């Protein structure tokens, strides 16, 4: 490891020791941050996988039920049933800070006033069968899970980027900056000791 190109003086030695102290403290903080990010990242990956499996399973089941329900209805009637959707939702995004990483938090709110005014479904119960109603209701209930999945996946992406940046900074301090400072400090201390011994020898020669 090449040492820093500085003059071997006591002032430089003091400055380098302060830099080493700061670098060592920063290294510990960054390692703690990296480890905590990794812990949360692993938890989110696990949640993401479980949530995705659940959603895919429920979507497949809902699609199958929808196809069966649609088969028992007139195709023109089905088109009319969904021609004018009345279910409205409002989506907004907040930002949450996790270990200095800004991640999205999705919130959704249904327009309950309009639903109460026009009915829970975009069609009349009299115009459709119960299987169709049940399928649409299940699909609506999946919205919250879908938003959570999008939230988790984006958070994982942002965390992965920050983990990589933090890892590079930790490695830079651990394998480059800190060893370089330590080697330079050791070099200056040796030079100062040599200068002190040489000065002592000169004094002894003068007094003898």
Swiss-Prot record:
Signal peptide: none annotated. It holds the Pfam family ATP-synt_D. GO terms for molecular function: ATP binding; proton-transporting ATP synthase activity, rotational mechanism; proton-transporting ATPase activity, rotational mechanism. The keyword Ion transport applies. InterPro entries: V_ATPase_D (IPR002699). GO terms for biological process: proton motive force-driven plasma membrane ATP synthesis. Keywords: ATP synthesis, Hydrogen ion transport, Ion transport, Transport. The keyword Transmembrane helix does not apply. Belongs to the V-ATPase D subunit family. Produces ATP from ADP in the presence of a proton gradient across the membrane. This is V-type ATP synthase subunit D. It comes from Streptococcus pyogenes serotype M49 (strain NZ131).
């Amino acid at each position: 490891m090449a040492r820093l190109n500085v003059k071997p003086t006591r002032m430089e030695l003091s400055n380098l020791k302060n830099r080493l102290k700061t670098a060592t403290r920063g290294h510990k903080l960054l390692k703690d941050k990296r480890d905590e990010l990794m812990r949360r990242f692993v938890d989110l990956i696990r949640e993401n996988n479980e949530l995705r499996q659940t959603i895919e399973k429920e979507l497949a089941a809902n699609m199958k039920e929808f196809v069966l329900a649609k088969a028992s209805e007139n195709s023109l009637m089905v088109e009319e049933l969904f021609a004018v959707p009345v279910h409205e939702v409002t989506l907004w995004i907040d930002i949450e800070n996790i270990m200095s990483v800004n991640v999205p938090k999705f919130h959704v709110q249904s327009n309950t006033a309009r639903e109460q005014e026009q009915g829970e479904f975009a069609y009349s119960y009299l115009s459709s069968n119960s299987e169709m109603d049940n399928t649409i209701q299940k699909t609506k209930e999946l919205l919250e899970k879908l938003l959570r999945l999008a939230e988790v996946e984006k958070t994982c992406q942002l965390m992965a980027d920050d983990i990589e940046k933090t890892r590079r900074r930790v490695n830079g301090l651990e394998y480059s900056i800190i060893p370089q400072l330590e080697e330079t400090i050791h070099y200056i201390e040796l030079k100062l000791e040599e200068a002190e011994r040489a000065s002592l020898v000169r004094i002894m020669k003068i007094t003898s």
